[in-house]
């Protein structure tokens, strides 16, 4: 039986041959099939969408992008898989195809984000899709869909199901918990990365290596858990998230600017082609709003 560790991206995790570097001194392996996804126009678009939007008005160095974060989550997903591949229960439950679907989902999890996505979604206006559903327009047809079929031997629907549908069985519950759960690849990356770029220590005060090293399956076998040795690291992760929301994401000046943006979008959205608007990079998005305002 083929080991999960034989997956090309996991084999290349410690390689020096083909990689890209992102802050802070993180080496991200780029296999040919990963590079084919990254080089699509849909994924490159994320390089022109900031990760934190209006937070940069308060923390001026917070100009990192969804592109950088997506690479970071992809790398974190590989670290999760490498740790869990040594768990016999995990390897019995998760096939190679499942693991590769998880790798792709981690890389593409933010594909449907548009500029200032979360504040605009929060208004709940008719005609504004969730970013998960908007991602389907990129994932189910076009170059990314072709690459998934031809290079990864995956059906695009498998990826969208993992990203946006309710898990149907324990296998999907495990994978979903690795991507969106109390301790997940997304959270471990964005807390550290956002903290680093904002110039604050709050999101980096937990032992990431210890936490990953303690990952295992829970008792029922339908999600992630941590061994006792990772308990303190997990508690520090929870506190790090709390402080990042208190001091960064929900900073009073950020919330004020967010309310102004929401008000402007509420007043102008009827004059805009939302599908076209949401496909634009951040600068063009702001220009479109400004022109609509006259």
Identify what each model region corresponds to.
Residues 1-101, 111-294:
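Histidine-centered, transition-metal-coordinating active-site segments
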Residues 108:
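Aromatic-lined, polymer-binding surfaces characteristic
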